[in-house]
């Protein structure tokens, strides 16, 4: 069972993205209702999502609200993973964005440990890291996020490439090993796949 906190996309759009990925039907076709001949694949994808017990929230904005929902679901029937898309969109009480980000990152880390759930937290990349790539993580609030997370994976597009990217495992607290995984982006499904 899993929860997705979609702080950027509305729930129906996030669901369509998942269905498109699982059914291999272009998002545009699903959005436009042009699904003739694909109904079985779409229904199969919807059934798979239901079997996962996956819920998508698009109306939860603060770390306290996220933690409350996670605790509720964990107590009511178990929970395996939590995904947040994306951490910089979590609203906080402080006027300082970095203090809010630090609090959110630490709370996600505590929640994972205390409730024994895997958390996947997406982050934006800051503009400076795109212009001047370095060994730094290049995420907005990278220091706060890096200190709280067990693993950090960065997607990076090689210079001049539109559809190829690499997943760089920059931090791996549990296993220690780091490295690159070659990937490809499919614009039709908004999907990232392993590059052969």
Question: Regions from the language model: what does each represent?
Answer:
Residues 89-92, 154:
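Residues immediately C-terminal
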Residues 11, 90, 126-129:
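Feature marks short, surface-exposed loop/turn motifs that line or immediately flank catalytic pockets
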Residues 91-99:
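Conserved ATPase-coupling elements of RecA-like P-loop NTPase cores
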Residues 82-83:
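Walker B beta-strand of ABC/ABC-like P-loop ATPase nucleotide-binding domains
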Residues 16-18, 95-96, 132-134:
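Short amphipathic alpha-helical segments
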Residues 1-78, 92, 139, 180-187, ...:
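Cytosolic-facing regulatory segments adjacent to core modules
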Residues 103-196:
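Phosphate-binding/switch region of NTP-binding enzymes
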């Amino acid at each position: 069972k899993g929860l997705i906190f979609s702080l950027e996309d509305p729930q129906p759009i996030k669901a369509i993205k998942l269905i498109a990925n699982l059914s291999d039907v272009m998002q545009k076709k699903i959005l436009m209702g042009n699904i003739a001949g694909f109904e079985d694949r779409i229904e199969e994808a919807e059934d798979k999502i239901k079997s996962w017990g996956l819920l998508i929230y698009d109306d939860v904005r603060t770390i306290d609200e996220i933690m409350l929902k996670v605790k509720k679901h964990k107590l009511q029937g178990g929970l395996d993973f939590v995904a947040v898309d994306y951490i910089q969109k979590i609203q906080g009480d402080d006027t300082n964005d970095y203090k809010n980000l630090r609090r959110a990152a630490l709370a996600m880390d505590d929640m994972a440990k205390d409730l024994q759930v895997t958390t996947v937290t997406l982050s934006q990349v800051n503009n400076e890291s795109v212009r001047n790539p370095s060994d730094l993580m290049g995420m907005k609030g990278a220091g706060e996020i890096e200190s709280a997370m067990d693993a950090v994976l960065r997607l990076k597009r090689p210079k001049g490439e539109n559809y190829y990217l690499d997943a760089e495992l920059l931090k791996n607290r549990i296993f220690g090993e780091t490295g690159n995984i070659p990937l490809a982006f499919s614009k039709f499904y908004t999907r990232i796949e392993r590059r052969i």
